[in-house]
């Protein structure tokens, strides 16, 4: 914007203040700018008449004009000096900035630069007024009279352009070209006549040239550019008529520049005085023989260029320095530099000028001037005549003007200058253009510069600001006429022999651009872009000119110059054919080139110029033919020419980069990167074309008269059918021999980068271009991880090596794809496990692997267990043993089982295969010397059948493998979203789920409305199966439910008023229990009713639904679910509700009850329960149960209850508004029914805890019976004498209410079993993970990452048991343990952090403050280990819910094989009771809070075993993880072992544990007389190795 603001300004004639063009008044004095000269309007009106003149009339007018003009010039010479002084005085004062420090030294008149050169050299600066984008322009539209005040130059009413709008200089040239369009239409006939009379025209032309030369010398002192008057002739060729818009110029390279290397012009000095910077005086140029002299305007212009100069200092405060540098860069090694800058059309000229060195340009033009004299002396005379008749502006050499391309042209009233137009170029492109060389030397020693100015004799009128609207309308009208003229000219060229020398391009209408600024958006490398663009155009024109350049060398040179001129005029059409209303930001450099082909006009112009300069008629005809062919080719390319010359950048996706550019215009990425992509696309296209051609050829070669068989359905079709008449299959695909392109197994290799399957013969991936890696590296990269830490490939390769050459040879013929298995044994440098078994085939080794544990694995494992426990020791062999190794794959194990079934021992197999090959035997002997114990990781000798340290048998590995496979099968079913999660705000999760549920509900409502139906839930229909487990027996006698009614059909005591509502300020007293024994749910609802917001969160549908569809959000077994129910409720024969209801005709109680019944299967499933279950279901919050009885503890404890601690917990829970419920007479309490009834209590009943108070030393609790009646009758009852007036007013201000009572804390401890607390919090985060409680191992293991200290609640849920009857229910014992861990990659059990109680309940939980660290969560359950569940889909499911005050990261991982044993050992060491049985031996017992017993023995002896006998046979209602209640084990030295884990079987009944521990020291691992021979554990621990395997003391 800086450069543009420097030219969009005008000088006040009164005070010389510089004002921006947008302002119509002077900022300083208020003088109104003059914009309507009357003389210009008259000239404008005359311009419209000029266009209609013929060429003959124009010639006569030119001759008359010359005589009149010479008479007038003498009179004008006297006043010329005063006129140009007046003009430049105002310009100089406007452009000069007077510095404050030198204002007193500034002369009053700055016209004479000689008097002020010292001051000018030191203080002249170009004043630039910075643009104000928010400046509003106020002007009156001349068309409709609207007073406009906006930033645009267009009227808001009629869209008329303002007469004040600035315009570009190119629009002036376009206007002149259109004015001459009519007069030049018949010029072809005149030119043809000139060729037929060369002598006559030579004499006439020579006379005019002499007069022109005399007038040229005289016009050097008159400065015709400043004359206001102009002849009415529109096409006169006299030198006196060649006045135009005058632009001040500067010599950018002729002086010693400032430090910044920038210069410009401001003031004017006449050519009679010496130049203030020692510029040479202009001398009359010698006239060469046969060369037409340059017009007066040309010399005058060059004289002014030498006499005009200004100096601009570097302005450090100028904000447009970067833009100035770009402007000056285009002006290097050039003479003339105008303040009225060109637009982007000058880019091509500037670039073309830079292509040639200055000396080369001089020599080229001199040669072009001399060659026509030598070869064709008559042609210059003819051309002299024609040159005077034609506008000379077409010969403007690009080396003369290098003008910045960023800017606009401001039309000054009294200035004019010749411009090249499209019409003048097209009409004169068939002539030689001889340029007068005027060489001058300056003080800087620059090279000679060609000044090829030509006087313009066109009749184009001056363009002023008030002509903008007329010009726009005239351009539109002239477009159609020029298009018709182009067609007529093409026909004349093709038909007329005399017109063969003409090949002018069709003139294109040029639309002016108004008020469009900052057109060049890309300033960087614009000279290079322009140069490349011009080079491309010259190349295109040179191709046509080569056809005729052999006979005349000048033809080629003229063709090149002509192409530059044509590209200049064409660029005006291309660049300025946009009518811009307002400036909408910088345009891209290639924006105007999208719809135009820049090579079209240049090629035509070059061909025509070459043809015109050729004497041979045959060469001319050839050139015309070449031009016509070029025109025809270009017509076919115009449609896609822009896209075919563009390339797309793969880095930034910019699609309009010109083809000749080496870098992207947007991101400057190199175009070399596109070559590979283009080549690839070409190859693909060629392949597709070849394939298509091949198919067509085969179809053509196929016999036409024979039937063909469809490949899809095998139907024989007639030969005339092109598709199968049955299945529509293609005939071409059926008869062709082209196979399917899909690569089959063994015919491809997989890319390691993009996983694309490529053909084997392709060394490079066709997608990512990655090279194919060697087979060995590919095999190494595809290492698959085993559950036990090693890879399948390691033991596969080891199996091949152990098997020797026979195994390798047998598998080599079956494997097609190259793998590591069929490579030479010496090249496969893979790590070998200690002992491996051979495989039959490599294909079987890879193909039979499966994650499922049910693949005929268990029978063989059982056989192995029996053989290992029998004590039979196989025959020793140096190459192997009879026990299945630890590191063996599934396929290897299957092969091993197959070999066992054939009666072949593994030892003999290894021996036989090892003898097959020498290399194989060596590999087998080196890899089987030792084997690693899976229990203690000790490397044992190959001859040992049991571990030398822990005495674990080799067969233990098979059990470990089966356990790992089971874990893997379960883990495969988990999705990545289930494995790794992040905790989220509970409120956000609720809103998200409600939004999803609302969409489903709206669809149902819309369906019901469209069909005029009421919603009926078919998944929970109004039928007996929704009431009972067994509908047949339950629907018999005593069934109170007779019918199902909707709310408006239910009979109520209050009648029809008030209407039914979902909520009416829910209160605990509104709940009324029905005949169903679901007090646990209603007591939880009563607690929820204390907080209305919690009740409304449960019911998603909070308003009455006319269609009867409601949604309830519940948390079943730890997982949130939205339940959809209808409003059909069970009623008796009188129409009253049978089950729970709410007073005041509210629906929230029966609807919630029905939703809970639906998720559990039926209403009968709601019978009996605990309030904590109801609270967890309704809120989903973590819950805790505080036992109030010693018998309620999970394990009888000698410690008494801490009553004060319990009371403190109740008080604190009430303070934070936790929800609480009390269980009366439940659990293991001994209940006296009569005593409870006398006290007003119901045993096995749930009550709501409404308040907890410690007042005046009394500990009181406020309870409520869900029945709404039957209250407490003991101490602190409503009629108790313990109440004082103060206490009654404080605690019962509204008096007694039915079902609500106060009771002392002591009575609660006596009559109640426990108090359940629901920890409802706001602003907490939650995450819920789903897992499986697999028997015989621990599968639910979670890695927890705490990023900042947080308070956390952990709750482990199991699947609900209410879906089945009580007799079929069996709950698991649950426990969740939290450990610290060090490495997240390989987590191991660390220090114990916290654990929950192990209880046989629906869920257990614990609470802990966690620091920033990594934790390991282990979920435990034991009482289902020996239930015989084999189907993984029948394994019990669990959900781990984690609530935290801060956000957490959780990830489900696969536990290590011994993680369960390490967890129990760590837990027992921390929480268990320690018993020193003997020296070096310690026994640990874990009973408290464990719902069973854990016995763990530690052997600290270094070289002695400890035999331990544990007898628990007197216990009842417990189960053992060993499968038996009596165990015998041999604990190795320096190791610990979990001996037995006893678990409560039924949670409702009590249990008893009696254990007796006997131990002794031994010098060997065997049990001797305590067990079978050779046994170390009885019963064996293979099935439970993960829990009962000995572990090293760490």
UniProtKB/Swiss-Prot annotation:
EC number(s) reported in the record: 3.4.22.-
Residue ranges, compositional bias (Low complexity): 438-459
Keyword line: Developmental protein, Hydrolase, Metal-binding, Phosphoprotein, Protease, Repeat, Sensory transduction, Thiol protease, Vision, Zinc, Zinc-finger
RanBP2-type ZnF: 1-35, 135-164, 643-673, 704-733, 744-774, 927-956
Signal sequence, renumbered to the chain: none
A molecular function (GO) term: zinc ion binding
List of residues that carry Phosphoserine: 250
Gene disruption: observed consequences: Mutants cause specific cells to degenerate in the developing optic lobes, resulting in the absence of certain classes of columnar neurons.
One Pfam family of this chain: Zn_ribbon_RanBP
CDD domains xref list: CysPc (cd00044)
Protein family per UniProt: Belongs to the peptidase C2 family.
Additional notes on this entry: Although homology to other calpains is high within the protease domain, the lack of calcium-binding sites suggests that this protein is a protease that may not be activated by calcium ions.
Name recorded for this polypeptide: Calpain-D
Lineage: Eukaryota, Metazoa, Ecdysozoa, Arthropoda, Hexapoda
């Amino acid at each position: 914007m800086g450069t543009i603001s420097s030219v969009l300004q005008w000088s006040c004639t009164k005070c010389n203040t510089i004002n921006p063009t947008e302002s119509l008044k002077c900022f300083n004095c208020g003088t109104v700018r003059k914009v309507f000269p009357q003389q210009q309007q008259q000239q404008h009106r005359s311009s419209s008449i000029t266009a209609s003149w013929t060429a003959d009339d124009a010639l006569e007018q030119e001759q008359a004009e010359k005589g009149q003009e010479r008479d007038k010039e003498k009179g004008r010479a006297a006043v010329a000096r005063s006129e140009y002084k007046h003009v430049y005085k105002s310009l100089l004062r406007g452009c000069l900035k007077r510095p404050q420090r030198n204002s007193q030294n500034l002369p009053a008149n700055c016209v004479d630069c000689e008097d002020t050169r010292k001051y000018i050299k030191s203080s002249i600066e170009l004043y630039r007024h910075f643009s104000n984008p928010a400046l509003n322009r106020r002007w009156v539209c001349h068309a409709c009279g609207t007073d406009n005040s906006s930033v645009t130059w267009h009227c808001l009413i009629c869209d008329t352009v303002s007469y004040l709008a600035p315009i570009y200089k190119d629009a002036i040239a376009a206007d002149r070209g259109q004015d001459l369009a009519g007069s030049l239409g018949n010029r072809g006939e005149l030119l043809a006549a000139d060729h037929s009379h060369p002598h006559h025209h030579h004499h006439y032309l020579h006379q005019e040239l002499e007069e022109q030369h005399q007038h040229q010398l005289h016009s050097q002192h008159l400065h015709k550019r400043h004359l206001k008057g102009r002849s009415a002739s529109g096409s006169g060729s006299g030198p006196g008529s060649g006045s135009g818009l005058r632009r001040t110029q500067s010599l950018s390279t002729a002086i010693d520049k400032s430090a910044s290397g920038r210069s410009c012009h401001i003031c004017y000095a006449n050519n009679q005085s010496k130049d203030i910077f020692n510029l040479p005086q202009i001398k009359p140029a010698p006239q060469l023989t046969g060369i037409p002299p340059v017009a007066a305007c040309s010399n005058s212009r060059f004289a002014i260029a030498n006499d005009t100069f200004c100096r601009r200092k570097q302005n450090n405060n100028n904000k447009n320095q970067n833009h100035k540098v770009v402007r000056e860069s285009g002006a290097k090694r050039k003479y003339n530099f105008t303040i009225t800058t060109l637009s982007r059309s000058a880019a091509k000229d500037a670039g073309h000028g830079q292509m040639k060195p200055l000396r080369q340009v001089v020599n080229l033009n001199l040669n072009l001037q001399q060659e026509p004299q030598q070869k064709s002396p008559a042609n210059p005379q003819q051309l002299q005549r024609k040159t005077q008749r034609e506008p000379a502006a077409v010969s403007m050499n690009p080396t003369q003007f290098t003008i910045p391309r960023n800017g606009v042209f401001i039309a000054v009233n009294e200035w004019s200058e010749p411009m090249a137009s499209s019409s003048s170029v097209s009409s004169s492109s068939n002539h030689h253009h001889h340029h007068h060389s005027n060489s001058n030397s300056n003080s800087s020693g620059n090279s000679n510069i060609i000044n090829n100015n030509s006087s313009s004799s066109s009749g184009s009128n001056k363009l002023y600001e008030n002509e903008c609207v007329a010009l726009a309308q005239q351009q539109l009208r002239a477009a159609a006429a020029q298009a018709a003229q182009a067609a007529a000219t093409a026909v004349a060229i093709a038909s007329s022999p005399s017109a063969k020398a003409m090949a002018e391009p069709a003139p294109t209408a040029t639309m002016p651009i108004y008020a469009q600024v900052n057109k060049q958006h890309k300033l960087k490398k614009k000279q290079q872009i322009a140069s490349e663009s011009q080079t491309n155009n010259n190349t295109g024109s040179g191709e046509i000119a080569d056809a005729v350049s052999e006979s005349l060398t000048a033809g080629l040179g003229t063709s090149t110059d002509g192409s530059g001129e044509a590209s200049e005029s064409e660029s005006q059409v291309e660049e300025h054919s946009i009518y811009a209303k307002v400036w909408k930001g910088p345009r891209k450099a290639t924006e105007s080139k999208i719809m135009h082909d820049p090579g079209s006009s240049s090629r035509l112009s070059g061909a025509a110029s070459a043809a015109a300069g050729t004497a041979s008629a045959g060469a001319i005809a050839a050139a015309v033919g070449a031009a016509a062919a070029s025109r025809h080719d270009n017509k076919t390319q115009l449609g896609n020419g822009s896209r075919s010359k563009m390339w797309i950048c793969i880095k930034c996706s910019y699609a309009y980069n010109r083809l000749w550019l080496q870098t992207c215009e947007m991101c400057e990425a190199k175009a070399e990167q596109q070559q590979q992509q283009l080549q690839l696309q070409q190859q693909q296209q060629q392949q597709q074309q070849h394939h298509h051609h091949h198919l067509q050829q085969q179809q053509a070669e196929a016999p036409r008269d024979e039937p063909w068989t469809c490949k899809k359905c095998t139907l024989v079709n007639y030969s005339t059918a092109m598709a199968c008449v049955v299945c529509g299959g293609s005939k071409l695909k059926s008869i062709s021999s082209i196979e399917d392109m899909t690569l089959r197994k063994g015919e491809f290799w997989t890319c390691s980068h993009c996983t694309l399957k490529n053909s084997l013969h392709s060394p490079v991936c066709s997608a990512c271009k990655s090279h194919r890696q060697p087979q060995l590296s590919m095999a190494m990269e595809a290492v698959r991880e085993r559950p036990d830490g090693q890879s399948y490939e390691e033991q596969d390769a080891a199996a091949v090596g152990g098997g020797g050459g026979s195994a390798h040879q047998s598998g080599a013929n079956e494997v097609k794809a190259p793998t590591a298995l069929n490579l030479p044994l010496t090249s496969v440098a893979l790590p070998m496990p200690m002992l491996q078994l051979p495989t039959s085939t490599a294909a079987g080794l890879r193909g039979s692997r499966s994650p499922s544990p049910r693949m005929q694995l268990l029978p063989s494992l059982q056989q192995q267990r029996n053989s290992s426990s029998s004590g039979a020791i196989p025959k020793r062999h140096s190459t192997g043993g009879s026990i299945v190794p630890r590191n063996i794959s599934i396929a290897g194990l299957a092969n091993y089982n197959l070999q066992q079934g054939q009666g072949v021992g593994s030892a003999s197999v290894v021996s036989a295969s090892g003898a097959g090959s020498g290399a194989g035997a060596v590999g087998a002997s080196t890899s089987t010397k030792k084997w690693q114990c899976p229990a203690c990781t000790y490397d044992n000798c190959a001859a040992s059948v049991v571990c030398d340290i822990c005495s674990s048998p080799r067969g233990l590995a098979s059990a470990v493998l089966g356990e790992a496979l089971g874990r893997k099968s379960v883990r495969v079913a988990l999705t990545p979203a289930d494995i790794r999660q992040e905790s989220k705000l509970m409120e956000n999760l609720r809103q998200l789920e409600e939004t999803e549920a609302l969409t489903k509900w709206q669809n149902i409502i819309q369906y019901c409305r469209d069909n005029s139906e009421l919603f009926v839930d078919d998944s929970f229909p109004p039928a007996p199966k929704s009431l009972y487990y067994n509908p047949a027996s339950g629907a018999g006698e005593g069934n109170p439910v007779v019918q199902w009614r909707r709310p408006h059909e239910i009979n109520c005591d209050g009648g029809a008023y008030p209407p039914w509502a979902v909520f009416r300020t829910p209160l605990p007293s509104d709940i009324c229990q029905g005949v169903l024994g679901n007090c646990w749910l209603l007591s939880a609802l009563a607690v929820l009713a204390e907080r209305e917001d919690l009740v409304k969160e449960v019911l998603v549908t909070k308003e009455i639904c006319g269609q009867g569809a409601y949604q309830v959000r519940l948390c079943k077994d730890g997982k949130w679910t939205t339940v959809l129910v209808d409003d059909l409720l069970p009623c008796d024969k009188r129409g009253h509700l049978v089950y729970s209801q709410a007073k005041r005709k509210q629906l929230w109680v029966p609807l919630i009850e029905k939703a809970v019944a639906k998720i559990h299967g039926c209403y009968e499933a709601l019978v009996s329960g605990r309030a904590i279950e109801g609270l967890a279901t309704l809120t989903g919050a973590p819950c805790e149960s505080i036992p109030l009885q010693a018998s309620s503890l999970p394990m009888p404890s000698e410690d008494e209850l801490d009553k004060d601690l319990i009371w403190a917990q109740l008080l604190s829970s009430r303070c934070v508004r936790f929800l609480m419920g009390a269980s009366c007479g439940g659990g293991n309490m001994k209940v006296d029914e009569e005593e409870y009834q006398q006290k007003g209590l119901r045993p096995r009943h749930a009550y709501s805890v409404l308040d907890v108070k410690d007042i005046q030393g009394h500990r009181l609790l406020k309870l409520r019976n869900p029945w709404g009646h039957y209250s407490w009758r003991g101490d602190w009852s409503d009629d108790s004498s313990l109440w004082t007036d103060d206490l009654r007013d404080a605690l019962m201000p509204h008096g007694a209410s039915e079902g609500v009572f106060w009771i002392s804390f002591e009575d609660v401890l006596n009559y109640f079993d426990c108090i359940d607390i629901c920890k409802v919090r706001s602003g907490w985060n939650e995450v819920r993970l789903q897992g499986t409680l697999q028997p015989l191992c621990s599968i639910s293991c979670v890695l927890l990452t705490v990023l900042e200290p947080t308070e956390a609640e952990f709750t482990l849920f199991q699947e609900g048991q209410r879906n089945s009857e009580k007799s079929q229910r069996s709950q698991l014992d649950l426990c969740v343990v939290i450990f610290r861990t060090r490495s997240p990659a390989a987590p191991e059990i660390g220090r114990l952090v916290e654990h929950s109680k192990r209880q046989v309940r629906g869920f257990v939980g614990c609470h802990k403050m966690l620091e920033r660290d990594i934790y390991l969560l282990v979920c435990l359950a034991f009482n289902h280990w020996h239930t015989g569940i084999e189907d993984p889909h029948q394994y019990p499911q669990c959900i781990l819910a984690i609530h935290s005050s801060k956000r957490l990261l959780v990830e489900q991982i696969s536990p290590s094989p011994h993680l369960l044993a390490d967890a129990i050992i760590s837990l027992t060491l921390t929480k268990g009771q320690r018993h020193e049985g003997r020296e070096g031996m310690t026994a640990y017992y874990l009973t408290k809070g464990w719902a069973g017993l854990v016995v763990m023995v530690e052997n600290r002896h270094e070289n002695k075993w400890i035999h331990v006998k544990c007898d628990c046979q007197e216990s009842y209602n417990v189960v053992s993880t060993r499968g038996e209640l009596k165990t015998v084990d041999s604990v190795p030295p320096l190791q610990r072992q979990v001996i037995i884990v006893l678990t409560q079987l039924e949670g409702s009944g009590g249990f008893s544990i009696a254990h007796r521990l006997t131990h002794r020291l031994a010098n060997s691992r065997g049990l001797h007389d305590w067990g079978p021979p050779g046994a170390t554990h009885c019963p064996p621990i293979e099935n439970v190795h993960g829990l009962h395997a000995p572990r090293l003391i760490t």
